[in-house]
């Protein structure tokens, strides 16, 4: 199989026992991205937290200086003056109950991020079981529940990404594309790592950054020396 052959070629370029510097890792992530499409470059960060405890959750959002390379479709759930404000700011879809019903009845998901004004959360709450498992539920911590919809849309379109520790204590976040220059990946990497380090819960004990790895969509994982993540 072609893909298997490419993957094997990619694995020959890395030493699985080596902890690379961030620069070396970004260079290797691009070299091992051999698929015939613009692969996403993603970070996987294993944290020393127990997400079963509410006081050890790691969640937030950060604007990457060079974005992710992906066109993000934004759905805004609002009413009144906020509708025009959202449209002017570049939202892809703006409305209220009609979109809530569309999601419920038609299983409609032609969007990547949902922004809602606080006065809409009573209605949006009906979507908790649908949007929650997909990581699409608006949340004040990630800045997606706000009356300042224009600012939220602008930040999302500029490259704002959400990060959240999963039940296995890992955070998965895209930091760019194969088409990015190494320096842009490195800039995005540093900004994201700074945010995650700042988000360390006070209840987390011991080593916080257990492991950090970067990979392309179809490429192997490349381990990064967690001591050097901000160098």
UniProtKB/Swiss-Prot annotation:
HAMAP family: Ribosomal_uL1_B. InterPro entries: Ribosom_uL1_bac-type, Ribosomal_uL1, Ribosomal_uL1-like, Ribosomal_uL1/biogenesis, Ribosomal_uL1_3-a/b-sand, Ribosomal_uL1_CS. PROSITE patterns: RIBOSOMAL_L1. It comes from Clostridium kluyveri (strain NBRC 12016). GO terms for biological process: regulation of translation; translation. This is Large ribosomal subunit protein uL1. Keywords: Repressor, Ribonucleoprotein, Ribosomal protein, RNA-binding, rRNA-binding, Translation regulation, tRNA-binding. Part of the 50S ribosomal subunit. One of its GO terms (molecular function) is rRNA binding. Gene3D superfamilies: 3.30.190.20, 3.40.50.790. Pfam families: Ribosomal_L1. It comes from the Bacteria. Belongs to the universal ribosomal protein uL1 family. Binds directly to 23S rRNA. The L1 stalk is quite mobile in the ribosome, and is involved in E site tRNA release. Protein L1 is also a translational repressor protein, it controls the translation of the L11 operon by binding to its mRNA. One of its GO terms (cellular component) is large ribosomal subunit.
